[in-house]
Amino acid sequence: MAKLLLLTALLAPGLLLAAVLGTVLGLWSADFGMGVLALKAGRVLAYLGLAGALIACLLAFRERRLLGIAGVALLFAAGTLGGYLVQERRFTDAPRDVATDLSDPPVFARVLAAERRLAGVSESRPQACEGLVSAPTQVASETAAWALEKAGFTVLGTAPFRVDGRKEGAWFGLTHDVTVRIRPGRTDVRVAGRDNLQVGDEACRLAKAVVAELTP
């Protein structure tokens, strides 16, 4: 009985691992792997695992030899559910397309625009991001490329007055595109996600990271 309850506590972490591996291997999309398996089914299993762990702890009070199994079950269950609760607070409703200049936002290079169309991303207009402002300086394209790399992006192309890049997440491969537009006296940044998943203020965070590297 106790071993079965331990297995119940391990279901959510196991499903999370399967969701990540399946997405990385291309067995299913990030929307399904993260949105359905990890965030929806995994959350249900996390609560089920915690219930199983608590039952195992009650059994351990009667049979001391079950203390080890109960402790392991509670550790996994509490850690997994805690992770989900933290993610719920992070994954708030936030813009997935942000820019430092909303009146005249930078546009993505043709290669990025083509990739976004092939990925089925619909056209969107950047929205405001609290605290995101342009860099009040004209930087060299090499400096902009360096800033993108420091912020975790892969540089895809550079030109005298622009740099473009892409960043893929380590777990589910969620992709964010970035473009840096360079003009006299200011440098603007735009970051937009490709996936339909709501991952909180990730686009805003990445854009701020790029601007921080551009600002002396």
Model-derived regions: residue spans:
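Hydrophobic alpha-helical transmembrane segments of multipass integral membrane proteins
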Residues: 14-17, 47-57, 74-78
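Ser/Thr-rich, low-complexity intrinsically disordered terminal regions
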Residues: 23-35, 39-46, 55-69, 79-216
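Membrane-anchoring/interfacial helices and their immediately flanking loops
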Residues: 1-27
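Interfacial segments of alpha-helical transmembrane regions
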Residues: 2-10, 61-77
